[in-house]
Amino acid sequence: MTQATLKQLSQQLAAKQVSSVELASQYLDRIEALNPQLNAIVTVDREKTLAEARAADARLAAGDARALTGVPLVHKDLFCQQGWKTSCGSRMLDNFVSPYSAHVVEQCAAAGMVTLGRANMDEFAMGSSNENSFYGAVKNPWDLNAIPGGSSGGSAAAVAARLAPVATATDTGGSIRQPASHCGVTGIKPTYGVVSRYGMVAYASSLDQGGPIAQTAEDCALMLNVMAGFDARDSTSLERAKEDYARDLNQSLSGLKVGLPKEYFAAGLDADVARAVDNAVAELKKLGAEAVEISLPNTELSIPAYYVIAPAEASTNLSRYDGVRYGHRAKDYKDLVDMYEKTRAEGFGDEVKRRILVGSYVLSHGYYDAYYLKAQKIRRLIANDFKAAFEQCDVILGPVAPTAAFNIGEKSGDPVQMYLSDIYTLSVNLAGLPGMSVPAGFAANGRPIGLQIIGNYFAEARMLNVAHQFQQATDWHAKAPSL
């Protein structure tokens, strides 16, 4: 049962072939058996989960069910969830039990979905490898020596290991697409503003966006139907008509124009990754798509621009963690300032401190124009690049990362090398566009490789259509690690 997709589980629950309690129990048993070696889940509460499952079964029996009622999921540990610890992978919030729920969590609860637990993540979503968690690194289910990708590494590893059929996640610079690629699962980051950020603990507010990680594009579409929607409590939430993201899944790809950015296939791209992407493009051509070369000339500027803008926003967002009202507080201090200093020194990890320092520096008097303002201008140029590209094509294809997953510890001593692994994902966030990762093969060492699909604003249904048709023609998404 734990190998089934979201769609299959939904059908089995509706047909009364399995109950939500039975389903939740099977997944909880699997988490208990496999999570000690993966470290993908940081919090489990069997009683709460089974209570939610019983409520879902009551809805199913009463005929009051929705499409995903009774289906279990895990939430990335930065979505506030009432009564559950919401740690953000940080010592700072290790003791924080949320008094309210995020909009995404509310939407999932309203749909009747059942929470299995909370997924591990890079601290405050800062990282590309999920080695920055206070609770320890997450292991890649395909190779326990490999990173799962970050920052939503726990979400991706949980879905890949079939500890859950679907997981919520967030993407600020690639944090859904990177781990989905490295763990051989499907993930989509929607257009900025499609999913409410209310109750989603902020890293960089102009870049953060929630989305699902699941086994298939169809599952992602079903989950996005639950997660998306206007929320007045988030000032960046977009007021748009409700949309069915699964509506175009079965459309033909005949006449589809696929853009291949020449900058994405330059030096630094691993041969295994290039081969997987080339094979995926060939597969789409067989389905009727046409490939055109495009240019995104400011791609290489996305790294310096992102690593100015994101830390700047993080430094202001994380200034609220001072030990006064909630979270970690230092035990011994002389006065208020001493308490602030010791609390933050003890509560934050190295990568978070590094980004706070950079962010504070670029926002300081005398440097704001030289760095922050310049980065925002580059951001506009990057958005313009995409605007021009989408006049020539319907979707853009390329790699998610330059290589398959690297080893745990391999890049942790060199932050710049770690940042370079985000080269193909950052510009999508800077432009506010939707992007997704679809399993597209394996490297010679057996580690998964993802294909990145980038769409124009609000083109999620079209991207999911491309991904679904690709998955109908291939079986990369159906392969599971042997644990």
Swiss-Prot record:
Record has Lipoprotein as a keyword: no
Matches recorded under InterPro entries: Amidase (IPR000120), Amidase_CS (IPR020556), Amidase_dom (IPR023631), AS_sf (IPR036928), GatA (IPR004412)
Keyword Transcription regulation: no
Pfam families recorded: Amidase
Known catalytic reactions: L-glutamyl-tRNA(Gln) + L-glutamine + ATP + H2O = L-glutaminyl-tRNA(Gln) + L-glutamate + ADP + phosphate + H(+)
E.C. no: 6.3.5.7
Keyword set, alphabetical order: ATP-binding, Ligase, Nucleotide-binding, Protein biosynthesis
Entry annotation: catalytic residues: 76, 151, 175
UniProt GO BP: translation
HAMAP family membership: GatA
Job description of the protein: Allows the formation of correctly charged Gln-tRNA(Gln) through the transamidation of misacylated Glu-tRNA(Gln) in organisms which lack glutaminyl-tRNA synthetase. The reaction takes place in the presence of glutamine and ATP through an activated gamma-phospho-Glu-tRNA(Gln).
Family: Belongs to the amidase family. GatA subfamily.
Record protein name field: Glutamyl-tRNA(Gln) amidotransferase subunit A
Organism the protein comes from: Chromobacterium violaceum (strain ATCC 12472 / DSM 30191 / JCM 1249 / CCUG 213 / NBRC 12614 / NCIMB 9131 / NCTC 9757 / MK)
